[in-house]
Every structure is written in C-alpha cells, then in structure tokens.
Amino acid sequence: MYSKLMFFFALCSISFLFTSEAASTMLLESSYLPLNQSYAPGFLYKRDMLPPPLQAVLTYTCPEPRPLAEESYNDLLRAISQKSSSDFQNAYSLALSFSSDFYQHGLKTLKDVSFLAVEKFLWGLTRLWSSLILASFSALWWLVSNFTTPVFCLALLYTVTKYMVKTVSFLFGGLPIWIISIAFSLLKKSFSALRSTPKCLYEKAIDGFKSFTIPQSPPKSCVIPITHASGNHAGYASCIKLYNGENALMTATHVLRDCPNAVAVSAKGLKTRIPLAEFKTIAKSDKGDVTLLRGPPNWEGLLGCKAANVITAANLAKCKASIYSFDRDGWVSSYAEIVGSEGTDVMVLSHTEGGHSGSPYFNGKTILGVHSGASATGNYNLMAPIPSLPGLTSPTYVFETTAPQGRVFAQEDIAEIEGLYAQVMKRVQQAEDFKPKTGKYWGDMEDDEDIFFESKEDLSGNGVRGTVRGTNGEGSSTPKTSNVDGKEMMEKIISSLVGKINLENIERKVIEEISAKAMKTPKSRRRRAPKKQPESSKDTSPRSTTGKYQPPHVRSPASVTAANCPNTTTPSKKKNLAGGRPSSGTIPRWVRKQAASAGPSSAPKQN
C-alpha cells in the first residue's frame, strides 16, 4: 500500500513539473511579440514577412545538495517526522474520500431499492385485492346465472334468520331491563311525590296580622292583569326596567304553567289584549318561580304601562311593603311587611286572595319581588325574589358601597338563587359573544347599504331580422289602453265642475242680500245705566284710643281733618269726553260724528 502511494505521489510531481515548464516557455515566447501583433488576428497571414524572434537561453545552476551524512541527527529526525506526517495525512484524506464516496453511493442505491420494493409491494397488493373482488363477483354471477332459485332462497333465509336473532335478543335481553327500569322510575317518582309536601299554597290570609286597603293605582301603572283566553282572571304581571335598555314583563312561573293561553289586559280602560304567546322568554325558573318575558314592539304603549325599577335578592332587606290588586271599583293597595327568608323565598305578612299570584310587592315605587303564594307550614306568605342577572336585572359593574342593613338572604342563599338561573346567563353570554358571518354588526353600520338591481340591457335593434310570420286568424280584439296623466285628469275634473256652476243665480242672490241689508232700519242704540255698586257698611264700633300716637292708617275716620281738594279732577269713566254731545241713536253708522270740543287732536291724520 505504501509503495502504491509513493508511486502516485511521484506521478503527480512529474506532471506538475511538466506543466510549469510549458507555461514558462509560453510566457517567454509571448513576451517578445509586440502588443499589436501578439493577439491581432489580422497579422496572421503576414507571419512569414516578420523577422524571426530573438532566441534567449536562460541558464540556472542549482547548488549541489549536501550529502545526508553531513546533516545533523535533529535535522534528519525532523525531516523523517515531517515526511511520515505528510504521508499519513495524504493516505488519510484519500481513504476518507474513498469511504465518503462509497457511503453516498451505497445510500443512494439502498434508497432506490427500498422505493422500488415498496412500489412493487403496493402494486402487488392492489392486483391481489382486485383479483379477489373480481373472482368473487365472477363466482357470484356464475352461481346466480346457473342456480338462480337456490341462491335467492338462501338470501331470503339469511335475512329472516338475522331479524329473528335480533328479536330474540331484544325479548330476552333488552325488554326485561327496559320494563324493570320503567317500573323502578315510576315507583321512585310516586314515593317521592307521597313523601314530599307542597312548598306553598296559592293564597292565604295571615292569622294575627292586621292589614288595610286603600284605593290607589300602582306606580306608573306598571301592574298588568293576566286573564285566561275566556276572560276569567288568572293573575298579575308587572313591567320592569332592565339594565340592557329593554323593558320586560315579569310574572310568576306557575301562572304561565297553569294558564297556557294567558292574555295580558290593559287596566286603564284600553281595549287591548296581547296573548303571552307573543312574548319570548328571557329568564325562567320553576323553583325560583320568576319569569322574565320580552314583548312585541310597543307592547308598553298598547297596555298603557311604564317600567318600574327592581331590587334584586342581594340587596333585599326587611321593610314595609304594599301589594296591588284590581277590584270592581278599581285598583286597591294592601299593606304588607317583609320579615325574613325561607330557603330561596321571602317571608311576607300580607292578606291575599285567589288570583293575586304574580302581583309585585312594592316599597315606594320600587318592586321587591313577585307574590308566589302562601307557606304550607308557616303562618306567612311567600314572595319570589328577583335574581341578580348581570346585564339584565343588575348592572355589570360593582357598586363601591357598604352592605345593606337588615339583609334578608345570606350569601349562600343568594348564590343558590343565582344558580337557578345559571342556564339563562349562559344563553345571554352566547348572545353577547355572537359574531355574524360578515364580521360587521347591524348596530355598527352607519347607513343601510343600498341594493341595486341589474337593469336589462338595452338592445340596439339593429340585429338580424327574424322570419316574417303571417297571422293565422283574426287579430286580437283587446283594445289598447294608454296611460292617462294625473295633471290632465285634474284639469278635466275642474273644467267639468266649473261648467256646472250657474253664475246668474249667484249674482241674483248677492244683489238680493245687499239690497235687503241697505233697506234695513237701524236699531236705536240706547245707553245702559251703569250698575250701582253696593256701598260698604261703616264701622259700628269706633276704635278705642289710649292717648298714644297712632299712625294715619289706624286712626278713626272722625279724627282725621278734611283734606284740601286736589287741583286736578279725576277723568270721567264715560266713553264721551266733556264737550261732546252723544250721538243720536237714529244716525246711521256711516255718518261722521261731531268732533269733541276739548281742543284740536294731536294725533296724525289718517290717509
């Protein structure tokens, strides 16, 4: 191996020497040529006319190398180490290049072989699968064509057997389990219904509580009677104000459950009836017994009511209250009192009758809750509190105020009440997070976009004429109508009306009226005597004097000296001033009256 490397190195050095010698010879020869002739193609045909180039011979004598015996051991060892390291590096680089080439070639070959093997395998699998399918169809077709009747009988028997197996498995497997589960659920429901007692009665009069009623209308007429479709009374509802800017109808849930065809009636004498089926549910809870409804457009104006503010369960405290009901003589207000809580309901002392369900309890002009019914165990009525729904019945922000004194509900009860309406809040949040497909909300649009329809393209009429077609029968008898202008129609109507007026009769009647007024004798104008005003009676008892000074307005009339007469006189209240005679009653109105003699008038003359 070492001899081969040395031989290869010798060949490389010899080829390098020959290449360098040839290059130096070419440079020396080209240096004697002028610049304009060495590379100019035009002088090639005059080469024989040029003088021969000058020949120069360079001689260089190399010094004779020193013999190796004269070198020192250090130089010899250094030369041997350098020679061995260079030979090793050359051999290593050559081996590394050979190994890298072999690795690249082997990797490429392996890759090509693997791709080819996978491709052949997939194609073989495809051919095998297609062959099996084709063989199956061929065999099936051979059986059907040669043994048609037995094959159809076998298919029918297979179908019947399959459905029989399913029926047997259901009868002996799923059916008993289904029957047992239904029986167990019925027993459980009946047992729970027998054990559970009703939470509240619909109406109740509280024993020992003194109440009074006064004729009074609800605040803002926000209480609305609810009736059945037949017109019989069912309960009450109220119009409340929400924090999203809308007005909602609030009532008890059991009123809507017991009266599916309920109708809201105006209590202000308006003959307006709105079915509650046209209202959409905003929030509802069977256990909380409060339902909020969104009405059709302008339902408040149709029922003649305005929205009132509400107090949620988190801010409810013990206080005095009032409940309204509609009697034969009109609205009456009954006294009530909130005393505490029972679970998620509020204990109220009040006297109620049948049909009061859904009526709100007020404290001033604010709604506290909805009348739900009477307690089945205690001596009090129950009021359903209004849940705190952020964005609906309560604001989305938090007030920086202290807690209300005498709060009815604890924090756990408030959380339980809000949990009853958790599903409602999910729907509200989904509505808030709604994003249209276009990404642009209707409320954010400044103006509605105009819709332009494509008009029919106007044809020039210069195309190729169609075939002339003759009529096969008589023409159409439908007369052609032309559009009449409205202005022309009005002119025709006015001209026809003017033509019917008889001017001669009008002139005759005018002359008769004027002559009758001119021949009338004027009536005598007599003055009426002014009415005499009754004089006030004089004081019968004179004032007592003590000898002290009394102001003039306190002194008696007898003690006052007579005052001097003023220089001027009070003008007369009569219409005619002094110096002028009253006009005679027989003088007509158009005759000029005599001027007054009090002097010339200072007013400007009229034109």
From Swiss-Prot:
Protein name, as recorded: Protein P1
Family per record: Belongs to the peptidase S39B family.
Bias-annotated ranges (Basic residues): 520-531
Annotated segments matching region Disordered: 457-485, 517-607
GO cellular component: membrane
Class of enzymatic activity (EC top level): hydrolase
Active site: H254, D289, S357
Sequence ranges of Polar residues compositional bias: 474-484, 558-571
GO BP annotations listed: proteolysis; viral translational frameshifting
Documented EC number(s): 3.4.21.-
Post-translational modification: Specific enzymatic cleavages in vivo yield mature proteins. The protease probably cleaves itself and releases the VPg protein.
Signal peptide feature range: 1-22
Domain Peptidase S39: 206-400
Domain comment as written in the entry: The C-terminus part of protein P1 and VPg/P1-C25 displays RNA-binding properties.
Its job: Precursor from which the VPg molecule is probably released at the onset of the RNA synthesis. Essential for virus replication.
